[in-house]
A protein has these predicted regions:
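Conserved ABC ATPase signature
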Residues: 149-153, 157
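ABC ATPase C-loop
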Residues: 166-167
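Hydrophobic anchor residue at the start of the ABC signature
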Residues: 163
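Conserved ABC ATPase "signature" region
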Residues: 127-144
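ABC ATPase NBD coupling module
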Residues: 76-96
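Helix-to-loop junction immediately C-terminal to a conserved catalytic motif
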Residues: 58
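Catalytic Walker B motif of ABC-type/P-loop ATPase nucleotide-binding domains
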Residues: 174-177
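Q-loop/switch helix immediately C-terminal to the Walker
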Residues: 101, 108-119
């Protein structure tokens, strides 16, 4: 199996500047590996640090120490503490992120919001929009809505647009932060199928999923985040 992600002794704390610079430890000694075609689910109660770990991998949070190595352009590259240019390049080419919430640009149609990652990757506008439409249709977004900005959609529709945008990319590593939260049974099943297809394509995935049944369906392994709890 090809190693795609290797997290070694990563740690994170936050400095509370409005409270006299108090340091609030979040996680420490975070260590796990993810191979190509594998979905690893982070488990643990709310507040245990699951989302913080995903954000450390994606580069939204800077690590205080340790290594986060991803297979980027054929080589294992440490993104912990990396220069912003390298992190942005890895996001563009290697790591995708599917969150619960969509930050849509006003007045941009849903079809273009979903197609944008493919356009960035160099696909033609026509082909990107065809693929975007197919994925929106699969996630039960009516075609009459595709030309409208997602800011006018319901919360559930916005979430499905966000899922489509995340899954449309051909990146080899995908981070999933509660992708099935608030979805009905039919759309949860679609997301499970999308994850299965990504596995088949060799994509490495790290997921946060609170639904026990969904976790059983998608997880090849689970990592208990409580073992990384940082003592205050």
């Amino acid at each position: 199996m090809t190693l795609m992600l290797d997290v070694e002794n990563a740690r994170k704390s936050f400095t509370m500047h409005l409270q006299g610079g108090i340091s609030l430890p979040v996680v420490r000694d975070v260590s796990f590996k993810v191979n190509a075609g594998e979905c690893v689910v982070l488990s643990g109660p709310s507040g245990a640090g699951k989302s913080s770990i995903l954000k450390m991998i994606f580069g939204n949070y800077r690590c205080d120490g340790g290594r986060i190595s991803v297979r980027h352009q054929g080589e294992m590259t440490n993104l912990a503490g990396a220069e912003p240019r390298l992190v942005l390049n890895a996001r563009r080419m290697t790591i995708g992120y599917v969150s619960q919430f969509l930050r849509a640009v006003p007045r941009v149609p849903a079809l273009d919001v979903v197609a944008e990652p493919l356009l960035t990757a160099g696909l033609s506008r026509e082909d990107a929009r065809v693929r975007a439409g197919a994925l929106l249709g699969r996630l039960n977004i009516p075609e009459r809505l595709w030309s409208l900005p997602p800011s006018t959609f319901s919360g559930g529709e916005q979430q499905r647009v966000n899922i489509a945008r995340g899954f449309i990319s051909d990146v080899p590593i995908l981070l999933l932060d509660e992708p099935t939260a608030s979805l009905d049974a039919a759309n949860r099943a679609v997301v499970v199928d999308l994850i299965a297809a990504k596995k088949q394509a060799g994509v490495a995935m790290i997921a946060i999923v609170h639904d026990d049944e969904i976790r059983r369906q998608i997880a090849d392994r689970t990592v208990d985040v409580t073992t990384f709890a940082a003592a205050a």
